[in-house]
Amino acid sequence: MIQFQVPVVAAGLAIIFDLDGVIVDSNPVHRQAWVRYNRRQGIETDEAMLEFMYGKRNDEIVRHYFGDHLEEEEIARHGAAKEALYREMMAGEVEARLVPGVREFIQANAGRPIALASNAEPANVEFLLEASGLRRYFRVVVDGHQVRNPKPHPEVFLRAADRLGVLPADTIVFEDSHSGVLAARAAGARVVGLRTTHRDLAGTALNVEDFRSLELAAWLRNQEPLRR
């Protein structure tokens, strides 16, 4: 039973979610998957290497871990193998790793335009949305392969807003990474930070623990579209 007041955003506003660390608290599993995969390649993964991965696309991560000399096919092979390992590790864990309150929040706002905008691999996006049962609520999904420029470039959020048919300034973006916040701000969106990955995110309107936050509910009550 729901024990919190689920906030509903005002008509005329749209909601854009990142995926990892916003809908699913999956970044710890990504960390473990990279450690295991890199070890198989003879690479020991330190904390600085793991910190680099947050908010990044796989091609960036693979180049950082394995070097810029790799051919595109080899980069894709490393990325695909790691993500297959990640999905294997996440199997049966998705429901337990949903960020608290996110299911109720998405369902309560089903009448609003909702999009997902993520640097994540397409296979991971579909896996997580289908496994969580949330896919039907998203009118638009923009993954890391649909944009030329990954976060922190604003392209992914600009494309999501355009496909939803709303102004970027009338979107509320939920993010957990520094690069994601930079991208959303550059797009002109209103940004809420989730403390799942980083305790303090600069440049957000507010940072909250999860979607049950009373502070989030109060802030959303004051958000109106620029034009009615």
Predicted regions and their residues:
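Asp-based, Mg2+/Mn2+-dependent phosphohydrolase catalytic module
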Residues: 1-13, 103, 107, 121-228
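Active-site neighborhood of HAD-like aspartate-dependent phosphohydrolases
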Residues: 2-51
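Short, acidic loop-to-helix structural element flanking the phosphoryl-transfer center
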Residues: 4, 88-116, 122, 126
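Conserved SAM-binding loop
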Residues: 23, 98, 114-117, 149, ...
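An amphipathic alpha-helix signature
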Residues: 31, 35, 47, 51, ...
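Helix-loop "lid/cap" segments that line or gate small-molecule binding pockets
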Residues: 37-38, 57-71, 128, 161
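Anion (oxyanion) recognition and catalysis
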Residues: 39, 110, 185
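Metal-dependent phosphoesterase signature
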Residues: 44, 64-104
